[in-house]
Structure formats: structure tokens, C-alpha cells
UniProtKB/Swiss-Prot annotation:
InterPro entries: Prot_inh_squash, Proteinase_amylase_inhib_sf. SUPFAM superfamilies: Plant inhibitors of proteinases and amylases. It holds the Pfam family Squash. Inhibits trypsin; probably participates in a plant defense mechanism. It comes from Momordica cochinchinensis (Spiny bitter cucumber). There is a cross-link at residues 1-34 (Cyclopeptide (Ser-Gly)). GO terms for biological process: defense response; negative regulation of serine-type endopeptidase activity. Keywords: Disulfide bond, Isopeptide bond, Knottin, Plant defense, Protease inhibitor, Secreted, Serine protease inhibitor. A cyclic succinimide probably forms by loss of water between Asp-4 and Gly-5, that can then rehydrate to either the original peptide bond or to a beta-aspartyl isopeptide bond. Three isoforms of MCoTI-II are detected, two with the parent molecular weight, corresponding to the unmodified and proposed isopeptide forms, and one with a molecular weight 18 Da lower, corresponding to a succinimide cross-linked form. This is Trypsin inhibitor 2. The presence of a 'disulfide through disulfide knot' structurally defines this protein as a knottin.
């Protein structure tokens, strides 16, 4: 398990905090995961 734990999926997703984002993505200043 966790084989893709260091990967940020290339999905445009709105967020307010890092935990809103899939994988290793973080919530960027533009309000989207990246």
C-alpha cells in the first residue's frame, strides 16, 4: 500500500487545505491542488 503516496495526480481540484487534495498534492495559493 502507499505505492503512489509520493505522486500528485494531474487532477484540477479546488481546495482550501492540503488535506482536500489527493495523493501528495498540496493546496496552492490559486485555490487548486497541485
Amino acid at each position: 500500500s502507499g505505492s503512489d503516496g509520493g505522486v500528485c495526480p494531474k487532477i484540477l481540484k479546488k481546495c482550501r487545505r492540503d488535506s482536500d487534495c489527493p495523493g501528495a498534492c498540496i493546496c496552492r495559493g490559486n485555490g487548486y491542488c497541485g
